[in-house]
């Protein structure tokens, strides 16, 4: 088993593709990818480092598999776990709810002890509001818009994975 668990929910395949891009950059020996629809509480508890991918649907709603998993997520003790979040949204058609699900999942795991890393700048995005903000200038995790800015996805993922790897000291962990 790898040291990092990447868990995603996806209806269209976009968030799944992002999860696989992240795994490819980190390496299969470092990160395992799991569909949250097929995952259990014990699956998440087996990792000290978690990357959680959650898309936002319509008017700020979480993807259905994550929505179904939230009660289980509320049972997990996240103390000692390092968590980075990533998610997809549409900043044009749903500008008032862009990547809201990042905030929804943050609001579940942070009070349960999760240490969240991987805040991402809001510069370059055009939206009106988001519950996924860490502060005025940062999302709580990587925000991806495959509908309006697909040409920026690969670069954003690459930069974010490097940032998260540094914040998590993955090189130190792997070389210990």
From Swiss-Prot:
Cofactor: FMN
InterPro entries hit by this protein: Flavodoxin (IPR050619), Flavodoxin/NO_synth (IPR008254), Flavodoxin_CS (IPR001226), Flavodoxin_lc (IPR010086), Flavoprotein-like_sf (IPR029039)
One of the record's GO molecular function terms: FMN binding
Matches recorded under Pfam families: Flavodoxin_1
Source domain of life: Bacteria
Domain Flavodoxin-like: 4-165
UniProt record similarity statement: Belongs to the flavodoxin family.
Function comment: Low-potential electron donor to a number of redox enzymes (Potential). Involved in the reactivation of inactive cob(II)alamin in methionine synthase.
Descriptive protein name: Flavodoxin 1
Gene name linked to the record: fldA
């Amino acid at each position: 088993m790898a040291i990092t668990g990447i868990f995603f929910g996806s209806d269209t395949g976009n968030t799944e593709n992002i999860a696989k891009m992240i795994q490819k950059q980190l390496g299969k020996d470092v990160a395992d990818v799991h569909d949250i629809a097929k995952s259990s509480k014990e699956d998440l508890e087996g990792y000290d480092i978690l990357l959680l991918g959650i898309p936002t649907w319509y008017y700020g709603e979480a993807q259905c598999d994550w929505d179904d998993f939230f009660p289980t997520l509320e049972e997990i003790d996240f103390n000692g776990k390092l968590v980075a979040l990533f998610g997809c949204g549409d900043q044009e058609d749903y500008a008032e709810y862009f990547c809201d699900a990042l905030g929804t999942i943050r609001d579940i795991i942070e009070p349960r002890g999760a240490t969240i890393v991987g805040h991402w700048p809001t510069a370059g995005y055009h939206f009106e509001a988001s519950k996924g903000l860490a502060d005025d200038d940062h999302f709580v995790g990587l925000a991806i818009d495959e509908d309006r800015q697909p040409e920026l996805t690969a670069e954003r993922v690459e930069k974010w994975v490097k940032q998260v790897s540094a914040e998590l000291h993955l090189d130190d962990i792997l070389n210990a």
